[in-house]
């Protein structure tokens, strides 16, 4: 008995202090678990929503994830610390607190009072020795991390949580969970509407002008291009600093009047910058990492800019009607309306139904800017025997009656679908006239931002798209990744094959018709050209004729001898006022519709077309040009 008595006392275990685990290892462990879980859900989200599968999607999602984690973690820690001891004891999750032996629990529970008993600690089967420690503020914070991770699971799939049966929890927990779910759904709606997001640097142009030298302040920002839910339009938002939850600047894309890359003289020290100009006069300069990002941002913003159908219809109707009518009336051209009854040159039946007579009167000239000519008709004219594309903008109007010997080298300005230095806004208005029913209507114009390059503007389901064209010295055309021997080959290809769109999606767009170009108003010059006419059809005005092309079309010479006599008579009659002037070409091959103003081409046009004009237009020509149509 004496030997057995002290046995149990000697065998009683002495409590050994548990070493405190490394907090860095703990943070890394839970961060890895959260990252792996979020990565799987992120990949699943991209598979379900391929619209967000962009190269920088991972960075954007992770930044948003980290920012929300910090906010929620701080709020949860403050809530737990403010709550009473009982609430704190109930908030401890099962994974953070490990089951203890009865005697160990009693030893550890004594210093903290009776508000925390052994029954409050959950009994979990899997025991982790590294987190077996007493209750402390650090332990509570680590337990909150597990609670936040559970909340992430609910945030990743809010729909099942919203539809699930209510769990047994305190009213405060239910209220906070409902609040978190509502904020999650609102954030998800905004995330769905994001078009593009990236980190850039920007400054206001006024600050750049006010600063001396390079003292202008560049600010880091997170640029977000998204669709506004209410108006169904896009907005551009600047988040300063990049982690800010609300934008510092929010610009609707309908208020942006210009988006372009900067010229070397504008930003000599910065290569990868572009400019945003807003209607209220504000101007923002943004800097990207490389040239690729710069051009892609400009293309995305320009692609999302939607001018709006109602405004374009208003402008086009004004241009077609009252606005141009006032200009015609100011020219005092009362006799011009009689030119409608004059005989006209024979027209080909292929295009005669589509294109009206060239320059019969002022309103016809205005209407020509909105004439839509089928591209197939233009291509058939080129393929016809003797046909060529040199017929300026009369391709298909006078058939294939061309003189090969007098045909000079062709330029883009010789074709009816080329509109010269037409602005981006005006080009969009031309192709969008009529809305989606004019799907495939196009024009080709010079680039506003890149001299020497051209832009194909076309109607894509009621929206204007702009595709850049590059021409080398041999006339070869480069469109995206495709090369063509000429612009005509490019038109033939895209007439039968869909155009590859950079935005992706169903590219069911082919070129169907084009907007026929209009004569630009003549520019004032030192020596005005005189229209070739008979002795009875002459003009002694020293100014440029706004309707001189109309007069030339209405008064063609009946024969080469008449043309020579008309030229000499016109020169002698106008010498008293302004001296001799070179004759203006008659409407025909390489006529004034070509936007080349060199005198050599004008002389070639007269020599090539003097013998081709029909004599039927001679009887009424004196009346058509008797008035002065000078436009001052």
Curated annotation (Swiss-Prot):
<keyword id="KW-0472">Membrane</keyword>
<feature type="region of interest" description="Disordered">
    <location>
        <begin position="516"/>
        <end position="537"/>
    </location>
</feature>
<comment type="subunit">
    <text>Homodimer. Interacts with KIT/c-KIT, SHC1, EPOR, PDGFR, VAV1 and VAV3. Interacts (via N-terminal region) with SHC1. Interacts (via the phosphorylated C-terminus) with GRB2. Interacts (via its SH2 domain) with EPOR, INSR and KIT. Interacts with GRB2 after B-cell antigen receptor stimulation. Interacts (via PH domain) with VAV3. Interacts with NTRK1, NTRK2 and NTRK3 (phosphorylated); after stimulation of the receptor by its extracellular ligand and subsequent autophosphorylation of the receptor. Binds INSR, GRB2, ASB6 and CAP. Insulin stimulation leads to dissociation of CAP.</text>
</comment>
<feature type="domain" description="PH">
    <location>
        <begin position="193"/>
        <end position="306"/>
    </location>
</feature>
<keyword id="KW-0727">SH2 domain</keyword>
<dbReference type="GO" id="GO:0001726">
    <property type="term" value="C:ruffle"/>
</dbReference>
<feature type="compositionally biased region" description="Pro residues">
    <location>
        <begin position="519"/>
        <end position="532"/>
    </location>
</feature>
<feature type="domain" description="SH2">
    <location>
        <begin position="417"/>
        <end position="515"/>
    </location>
</feature>
<feature type="modified residue" description="Phosphoserine">
    <location>
        <position position="310"/>
    </location>
</feature>
<dbReference type="GO" id="GO:0005886">
    <property type="term" value="C:plasma membrane"/>
</dbReference>
<feature type="modified residue" description="Phosphotyrosine">
    <location>
        <position position="52"/>
    </location>
</feature>
<dbReference type="InterPro" id="IPR036860">
    <property type="entry name" value="SH2_dom_sf"/>
</dbReference>
<dbReference type="GO" id="GO:0005068">
    <property type="term" value="F:transmembrane receptor protein tyrosine kinase adaptor activity"/>
</dbReference>
<keyword id="KW-1003">Cell membrane</keyword>
<dbReference type="InterPro" id="IPR011993">
    <property type="entry name" value="PH-like_dom_sf"/>
</dbReference>
<feature type="compositionally biased region" description="Low complexity">
    <location>
        <begin position="558"/>
        <end position="579"/>
    </location>
</feature>
<dbReference type="Pfam" id="PF08916">
    <property type="entry name" value="Phe_ZIP"/>
</dbReference>
<comment type="similarity">
    <text>Belongs to the SH2B adapter family.</text>
</comment>
<feature type="modified residue" description="Phosphotyrosine">
    <location>
        <position position="629"/>
    </location>
</feature>
<dbReference type="InterPro" id="IPR015012">
    <property type="entry name" value="Phe_ZIP"/>
</dbReference>
<feature type="compositionally biased region" description="Acidic residues">
    <location>
        <begin position="400"/>
        <end position="409"/>
    </location>
</feature>
<dbReference type="Pfam" id="PF00169">
    <property type="entry name" value="PH"/>
</dbReference>
<feature type="modified residue" description="Phosphoserine">
    <location>
        <position position="141"/>
    </location>
</feature>
<dbReference type="GO" id="GO:0050873">
    <property type="term" value="P:brown fat cell differentiation"/>
</dbReference>
<keyword id="KW-0963">Cytoplasm</keyword>
<dbReference type="GO" id="GO:0005884">
    <property type="term" value="C:actin filament"/>
</dbReference>
<dbReference type="GO" id="GO:0008286">
    <property type="term" value="P:insulin receptor signaling pathway"/>
</dbReference>
<dbReference type="GO" id="GO:0005737">
    <property type="term" value="C:cytoplasm"/>
</dbReference>
<dbReference type="GO" id="GO:0050851">
    <property type="term" value="P:antigen receptor-mediated signaling pathway"/>
</dbReference>
<dbReference type="Pfam" id="PF00017">
    <property type="entry name" value="SH2"/>
</dbReference>
<dbReference type="InterPro" id="IPR036290">
    <property type="entry name" value="Phe_ZIP_sf"/>
</dbReference>
<feature type="compositionally biased region" description="Low complexity">
    <location>
        <begin position="604"/>
        <end position="626"/>
    </location>
</feature>
<dbReference type="GO" id="GO:0019221">
    <property type="term" value="P:cytokine-mediated signaling pathway"/>
</dbReference>
<feature type="region of interest" description="Disordered">
    <location>
        <begin position="381"/>
        <end position="409"/>
    </location>
</feature>
<dbReference type="GO" id="GO:0001725">
    <property type="term" value="C:stress fiber"/>
</dbReference>
<dbReference type="InterPro" id="IPR035058">
    <property type="entry name" value="SH2B2_SH2"/>
</dbReference>
<dbReference type="InterPro" id="IPR030523">
    <property type="entry name" value="SH2B"/>
</dbReference>
<dbReference type="GO" id="GO:0005829">
    <property type="term" value="C:cytosol"/>
</dbReference>
<dbReference type="InterPro" id="IPR000980">
    <property type="entry name" value="SH2"/>
</dbReference>
<dbReference type="GO" id="GO:0050853">
    <property type="term" value="P:B cell receptor signaling pathway"/>
</dbReference>
<dbReference type="GO" id="GO:0019222">
    <property type="term" value="P:regulation of metabolic process"/>
</dbReference>
<comment type="function">
    <text>Adapter protein for several members of the tyrosine kinase receptor family. Involved in multiple signaling pathways. May be involved in coupling from immunoreceptor to Ras signaling. Acts as a negative regulator of cytokine signaling in collaboration with CBL. Binds to EPOR and suppresses EPO-induced STAT5 activation, possibly through a masking effect on STAT5 docking sites in EPOR. Suppresses PDGF-induced mitogenesis. May induce cytoskeletal reorganization via interaction with VAV3.</text>
</comment>
């Amino acid at each position: 008995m004496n030997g057995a008595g002290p046995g149990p006392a000697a065998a009683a275990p002495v409590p050994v202090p548990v070493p405190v685990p490394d907090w860095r290892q703990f943070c890394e462990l839970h961060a890895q678990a959260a990252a792996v879980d979020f990565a799987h859900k992120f990949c699943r989200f991209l598979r379900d929503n391929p619209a967000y599968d962009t190269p920088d999607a991972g960075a954007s999602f992770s930044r948003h994830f980290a920012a929300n984690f910090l906010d929620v973690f701080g709020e949860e820690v403050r809530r737990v610390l403010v709550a009473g001891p009982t609430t704190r004891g109930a908030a401890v999750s099962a994974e953070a607190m490990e089951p203890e032996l009865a005697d160990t629990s009693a030893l550890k529970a004594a210093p903290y009072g009776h508000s925390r008993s052994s029954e409050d600690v959950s009994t979990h089967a899997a025991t982790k020795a590294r987190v077996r420690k007493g209750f402390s503020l650090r332990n509570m914070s680590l337990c909150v991390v597990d609670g936040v991770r559970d909340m992430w699971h609910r945030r990743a799939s809010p729909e099942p949580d919203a539809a699930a049966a209510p769990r047994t929890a305190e009213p405060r927990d239910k209220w906070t969970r409902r609040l978190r779910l509502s904020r999650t759904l609102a954030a998800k709606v905004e995330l769905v509407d994001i078009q593009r997001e990236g980190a850039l640097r920007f400054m206001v142009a006024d600050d750049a002008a006010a600063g001396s030298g390079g003292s202008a302040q560049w600010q880091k920002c997170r640029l977000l291009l998204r669709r506004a839910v209410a108006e169904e339009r896009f907005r551009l938002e600047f988040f300063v600093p990049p982690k800010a939850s609300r934008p510092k600047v929010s610009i609707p894309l309908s208020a942006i009047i210009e988006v372009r890359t900067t010229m070397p003289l504008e930003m000599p020290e910065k290569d990868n910058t572009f400019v945003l100009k807003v209607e209220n006069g504000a101007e923002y300069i943004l800097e990207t990492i490389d040239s690729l990002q710069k051009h892609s941002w400009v293309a995305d913003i320009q692609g999302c800019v939607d001018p709006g159908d109602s405004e374009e219809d208003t402008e086009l109707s004004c241009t077609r009607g009252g606005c141009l009518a006032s200009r015609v009336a100011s020219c005092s051209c009362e006799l011009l309306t009689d030119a409608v009854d004059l005989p006209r040159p024979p027209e080909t039946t292929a295009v005669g139904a589509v294109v009206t007579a060239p320059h019969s009167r002022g309103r016809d000239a205005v209407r020509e800017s909105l004439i839509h000519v089928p591209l197939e008709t233009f291509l058939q004219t080129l393929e016809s025997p003797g046909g060529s594309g040199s017929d300026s903008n009369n391709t298909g109007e006078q058939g294939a009656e061309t003189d090969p010997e007098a045909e000079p080298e062709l330029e883009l300005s010789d074709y009816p679908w080329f509109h010269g230095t037409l602005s981006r806004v005006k080009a969009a208005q031309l192709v969008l006239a009529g809305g989606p029913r004019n799907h495939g209507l196009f024009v080709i114009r010079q680039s506003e931002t890149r001299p020497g390059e051209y832009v194909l503007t076309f109607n894509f389901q009621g929206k204007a798209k702009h595709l850049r064209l590059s021409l080398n010295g041999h006339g070869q055309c480069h469109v995206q990744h495709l090369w063509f021997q000429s612009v005509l080959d490019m038109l033939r290809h895209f007439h039968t094959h869909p155009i590859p769109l950079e935005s992706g999606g169903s590219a069911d767009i082919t070129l169907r018709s084009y907007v026929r170009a209009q004569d630009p108003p003549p520019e004032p010059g030192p020596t005005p050209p005189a229209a070739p006419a008979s002795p009875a059809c002459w003009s002694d005005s020293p100014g440029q004729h706004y309707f001189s092309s109309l007069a030339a079309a209405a008064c063609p010479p009946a024969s080469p001898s008449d043309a020579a006599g008309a030229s000499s008579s016109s020169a002698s009659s106008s010498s008293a006022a302004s001296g001799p002037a070179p004759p203006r070409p008659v409407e025909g091959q390489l006529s004034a519709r070509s936007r080349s103003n060199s005198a050599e081409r004008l002389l070639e046009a007269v020599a090539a077309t003097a013998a081709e004009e029909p004599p039927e237009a001679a009887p009424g020509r004196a009346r058509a040009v008797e008035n002065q149509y000078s436009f001052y």
